[in-house]
Amino acid sequence: MSQKLVLILNCGSSSLKFSILDPQTGEEKLSGLAEAFHLDDARIKWKLHGEKGNADLGAGAAHSEALNFIVNSIFPLDPSLKEDIVAIGHRIVHGGEKFTSSVVITDEVVQGIKDAVQFAPLHNPAHLIGIEEAFKMFPHLKDKNVAVFDTAFHQTMPEEAYLYALPYSLYREHGVRRYGAHGTSHFFVSQQAAERLNVPAEQVNVITCHLGNGASIAAVRHGQCIDTSMGLTPLEGLVMGTRSGDIDPAIVFYLHDNLGLSVEEINTLLTKKSGLLGLTEVTSDCRYAEDNYDKEASAKRALDVFSYRLAKYIGSYMAVIGERLDAIVFTGGIGENSSLVRELTLNHLKLFGYQVDSDKNKAARFGHEGVITADNTPVAMVIPTNEELVIAQDTARLCIA
């Protein structure tokens, strides 16, 4: 009996992540990554029914060549795959204010994604390429393509949370406000937390920490986002792999006036040379800092700044939630796997009663989840994220009868 499967596309400026899921069971049939687009060593790797494969795409290859390879070289390894795909879900980083939920892609939706390019100049153009290529490769599914927006979950933020203290005309005329990111992940783990804590989803109060190379935190009250750390762009907020997060805005002028850096150079410094990379002066990889925390002053410095900033945000979000807090949730590559980051962060929150259970905390990694705080103390927990499943389920909800 044929299945109803969803193809998920996550197009970046130089890469394409793809997967095929059963939206009902969550079973992953195919997953893969095509990367190094526009370079001499463009390549693709995949896992089909547990079997791994890889290939070169050819010098200069990009999204079109990658999708061609998927359809013409990977799909034939299991001919039923293409036949069973009934819809396509696209991860879209920025939807501006226009999109508050996932939508079937129409000409109007495409225009809305184009309008938000100014807020995600690297990501949204790549998403548009992915949509165009999907229309070409799967013409029979043109009305079964769904856009799932990373910004949508944060559209419930109140005005006092999303406005900057800038001339209001900048918001009114140019849309300058806080939008957030990682919304699909924050939504998923908040819902999962509600289920694990036996709290109705519409009543759950959690602080969700999506920690990876990009990192953000969200305050979720009664199942809805009321604040998040990323802003107009994904540069604001927490310390990240190569991004600075929050800084004094006047540092930009200082770098220009005193060091002679151009706007482009400052942008590169803040987005690609800062964060853990800037603090360690070695790497953006949190695993290096964790492994060398007790050996290298730079590694300790990086994780201390990272966890201190995170704890400050958690404390402030406790205030804005303003009532019962059901849990602090850690997710993302660092959140799910770095017991040290979790311990350092929660140690800053002892005033609120948080007490790490060392054994539980160290056991919660590599896909293992659960509560990491001591019994009879406030709950902090690890929940692996699954953005692909959310995209598949939203796509199925809109397209599959």
UniProtKB/Swiss-Prot annotation:
CDD domains registered for this protein in UniProt: ASKHA_NBD_AcK_PK
Molecular function (Gene Ontology), one example: magnesium ion binding
Cofactor-binding details, from the entry: Mg(2+). Can also accept Mn(2+).
Enzyme Commission number, as recorded: 2.7.2.1
Catalytically driven reaction(s): acetate + ATP = acetyl phosphate + ADP
SS bond partners: none
Binding of Mg(2+), residues: N10, E387
Top EC category: transferase
Cofactor: Mg(2+); Mn(2+)
List of residues binding ATP: K17, H210, L211, G212, N213, G214, D285, C286, R287, G333, I334, G335, E336, N337
PANTHER family: ACETATE KINASE (PTHR21060:SF21)
Subunit structure: Homodimer.
Protein name: Acetate kinase
Species whose genome carries this gene: Pasteurella multocida (strain Pm70)
Upper classification of the organism: Bacteria, Pseudomonadati, Pseudomonadota, Gammaproteobacteria, Pasteurellales
Gene field: ackA
